[in-house]
Amino acid sequence: MSEKMDALPDIEQIHAAAARIAPHARVTPVMCSAVLDALTGAELYFKCEHLQRGGAFKFRGACNAVWSLTDEEAAKGVVTHSSGNHGAALALAARTRGIAAHVVVPAGAVRSKVAAIRTYGATVHECAPTQAARDAMAADIGQRTGARMVHPFTDPAVIAGQGTAALELIREVGGLDIIVTPVGGGGLVSGSALAVAGSGQRIHVIGAEPSGAADAYESLRRGSRVLEIVPDTICDGLRATIGQPNFELLRAHDVQVLLVDDAETMAAMRLVWERLKILIEPSCATVLAAVLRHREVFAGHRVGLVLSGGNVDLDEIRFATGASR
């Protein structure tokens, strides 16, 4: 995919994506908590993308990409590389169109997420846990099968699809001051920035990033993309390096990135479990962790938080396995 800015979507394409995915994607609800409002000093509106099909917002982008293909392109299938949620989303989206999906998965990926990819009907190809290995295997599959590459976060159709979550949130909750999303490769936060820019409303977009995978934060601070950071975080969905087009969109739309550590993220996840009575994954909890750590940024404001996913490995939770304290 070209990484030029003119290859990226605009608000019209986000609206087109919303119409394209409407027969397949869910309009997810918004939840509130008076306790969490009091704790943070802000009005919080949680956009429940963990209830999206496939358990994550990523179905939006994958679905838009799959249904943007011509019949001739679709007949050859799709391919991607993913450690979990995007792979499952693409597998499910491909199933809605009745086409083949190939997902390259690095060794050591979360077992429950790999199982979901298989459940949705994709062919899983395991590779070494490096970006070079992922790229090489996906390219080889594409060359052999003719399958169309759907990149997890730099594909324009994926970015447009991810932007539909913020588009819905803006429609569902009036008068928002801030929207917070997690930051990994940057598809959700850049799509959200585009949706906000096209809405005509003065809403500040903020990304929440693990301090152990702070490439987006450092890239914005230095003014150029930082590639040398080796991620060390429990947030498996946020270990990807920010994409070049995504980084450029963050700069163009004055997106701020705030850092949170894993302990803060896990504490925020527990708060969501306790107060909203919903199951979210660690990557998703970074948004509340950011509000709690950086109260001065959010206090007194109406804040939309995108709960990006709920694909938790239940085998890792003690009460689900019958383990005692």
Question: Language-model features: where?
Answer:
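PLP-dependent amino-acid enzyme catalytic core
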Residues: 1-325
